[in-house]
Amino acid sequence: MSKKNVDPFSDSDSSSEPPSIFSSDNEENSDVDNSVIINDKNTKSDEADIKYMDEDESSDSESESESKKKSKKSKKSKKSKKSVTKKKNNLLVGNRIITEYILIDANNYHFKSWIECFPDCKVNLKLLLFRPEWFDFFKYVESKTYFPQLESKLSSYLEKRQRIVPYPELLFNTMNVLPPGKIKVVILGQDPYPGSCISGVPYAMGCSFSVPLNCPVPKSLANIYTNLIKFNHMRKAPKHGCLASWILQGTFMINSAFTTVLNESGVHARTWESFTADLIDYLTDNYDDLIFVAWGAHAHKLCQRVDPKKHYIITSSHPSPYSVSNTMTSMSYGPNPKKVTYPSFNSVDHFGKINEHLKSRNKKPIFWDL
């Protein structure tokens, strides 16, 4: 009997825990479990199938004659495939095992800087997105008047030798890992982490709040861990800051600004405003009953675009040390907004609320413990 491809985003498994990414015996262990790969060995391929490595490429029951037929068919189509490939852009992403994009190890870091990827200082964002499920969205934003300006601004930053983070291969990291149809929860951050974990290794990795393995846990993420422990969603705080397992379970983690400059906060916030707004609109218009988690003023502003009757919104102050214990005054969602006071981050069971809502919609809850 042939095996079925296993989708790591599937809700069909009734188990409460997802496949383990880290060893339960040693949370400091940074060894990568390469159990999930992108079936995309050529960077020029547009396909991005996710499957488990222990699955056979062919059926156990496949006959020898069927195998020969496939071999002949493959040889016949080889030339045509090559000619098609030549017409495609040479993608800068998609040629790695998928876990290398989200299980990044600071002690084994191989991602290139912006100037290494675009030595001519001409940024082409389309080369940084390989998951085909997002191509419709990207085609839409490419038609907008702001998009050429966005690429021009990023190109000008390179000409000025700004050290942009995250690095290009990681810019659309969450999008490249998680297809839009598998998103359950959207957690909005504000700005990529601006600093370096060690020399040549930025904290920023294209997933809000997450950092590479063997990097110190940032204070905002430490406060998130404290909240998880407080409401019994986590046994103890991990010694790493990698949130890969959340993403693989359907948590879409982005910042309102996709880039910043190394050691500087907020400098590219306006650069990405229109792009991020269109991304939120795309999700809210094309998908139903998503959960949006708005921490802080920037995330709240973006979520004012979300229809609260169609989607579920959880709002509080930001988990940063400066606001984690403070309430936040802003406007309510929906038509006829009024000034309201939102609770402090540390007073809300964010992750419990998420799972309660998922269960109420017969969706598999997120296993938050790392």
Swiss-Prot record:
Positions with biased composition (Basic residues):
69-83
Pfam families in UniProt: UDG (PF03167)
Q: Where is this region: Disordered?
A: 1-83
**Biological process GO terms, please?**
base-excision repair, AP site formation via deaminated base removal
Question: Tell me, what is one Gene Ontology molecular-function annotation carried by this entry?
Answer: uracil DNA N-glycosylase activity
Residue ranges annotated as compositionally biased, kind Basic and acidic residues, are: 41-53
Q: Does the keyword Cytoplasm apply?
A: no
Q: Where is the composition biased (Acidic residues)?
A: 54-64
SUPFAM superfamilies in the record:
Uracil-DNA glycosylase-like
Extract the InterPro entries matched here: UDG_fam1, Ura-DNA_Glyclase_AS, Uracil-DNA_glycosylase-like, Uracil-DNA_glycosylase-like_sf
**Residue numbers annotated as active site:** 191 (proton acceptor)
The yes or no answer to whether the keyword Hydrolase is present is yes
Q: What is its EC number?
A: 3.2.2.-
Keywords on record: DNA damage, DNA repair, Hydrolase
Highest taxon, organism lineage: Viruses
PANTHER family reported for this sequence: URACIL-DNA GLYCOSYLASE
The cross-references to NCBIfam families, in alphabetical order and at most eight, read: PRK05254.1-5
Q: Which family does it belong to?
A: Belongs to the uracil-DNA glycosylase (UDG) superfamily. UNG family.
Q: What does this protein do?
A: Excises uracil residues from the DNA which can arise as a result of misincorporation of dUMP residues by DNA polymerase or due to deamination of cytosine.
The molecule here is called Probable uracil-DNA glycosylase
Q: Which species is this record about?
A: Acanthamoeba polyphaga mimivirus
Name the lineage. Answer: Viruses, Varidnaviria, Bamfordvirae, Nucleocytoviricota, Megaviricetes
